[in-house]
Amino acid sequence: MTNRIIKKVLSALSHQALVRVMSALFFSLALMTNFAHSVEYPSGVVRIIVGFPPGNATDIVARVFAKQMSEAFNGAPFVVENMVGAAGSIGTAAVAKATPNGLTLLVGSVGTLAMNPWLIKNLPYDPAKDFVPLAQLASVPMYVTVQSTLPVNSFTDLVALAKQKPGVLNFGSSGNGSANHLIAAVVASTSSIDITHIPYKGSAPAVTDLLAGRLSLMVETAPAVLPHVKSGKLKILAVTKPTRTAILPDVLTLSESGYPGFDAQAWIGFAAPAGTPREILDVLGRTAAQVVGSKLFAAKMVELGLEPMASTSPAQFSSYLNGEIKRWGTVTERIGIVRE
């Protein structure tokens, strides 16, 4: 009797309707499978490795992100660990070599994931092969900043002064090959000015010397310089991203300052070691997208002087990262930087 009823029902269904029913069934099973995996993950403490010291922009973003990921996983522990050294490559390499079980993850930067391959000989990891990009967390606008006594009030003024005194002006950075070194070098190359690079061990001592007048300028993040701009000790002349920023909407872009299309900014991203099981990657990618897309995370990024991402996905970040690796290879070749 039951079999006859089933046959009648099936015969009454059109082929397309049957396909829709079966598709819905498989979709439901897929959701149940994903839900099961999300319940199982994480199986222990999740370590998020940062290759920079506490207080660095990458570290600060990692801590905000880790806290919100922990909340998204019902209080599961997401702990930030700083493994400092070699322009962030020590910590990054540690993640590349870690067991790919989703318990050791990376919050890296444009420096560690896109610039270091062109700066460091025998780099102990390949960012294009050793990681699975999961989410871009924030972009980090960089600002051309000068000491307040320097007689310039715009980027155009700065270029004119530098051309009047070739080699006399100098700029500081947080170290050879750092993001603010390379971006400043691109600024100088694009505007055809001759300024001398002075590397420091971190941004803090460089900003100290900028305040003291021992440096002419820096290309730095808002968190590092904005307090001193507000106090009148520093001046911001331009931002290196293609659009103005929410935190400093009156600051001109370099595109608006005579260099159309100029775009050289830092960013921070989230990745897992290659070989991590697909179901874990899916859970991490989906949850990271929810965190990064939340109003809470976006508000915190703006508060820090960073630019939140409107949307992000593993595929988007992977495509962006591959483009950035190629772009910075071209840039380092153009400005004459060789691997050391």
Residue ranges with predicted function:
Residues K97-T104, V110, W118-P205, L254, ...:
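Hinge/capping helix and adjacent helix->loop/strand transition within the periplasmic-binding protein
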Residues V9, H37-E40, Q68-A72, K121, ...:
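Short hydrophobic alpha-helices and adjacent helix-cap/hinge residues
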Residues D126-Q136, G172, D194-I198, S216-L217, ...:
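Short beta-strand->loop
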Residues S43-V45, K230, R278-E340:
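An extracytoplasmic/periplasmic, membrane-proximal ligand-sensing/linker region
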Residues H37-K129, V168, N176, S192-T221, ...:
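N-terminal (or domain-start) structured segment
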Residues M1-A17:
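N-terminal secretory signal peptides that target proteins for export/translocation
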Residues V19-N34:
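Bacterial N-terminal signal peptides
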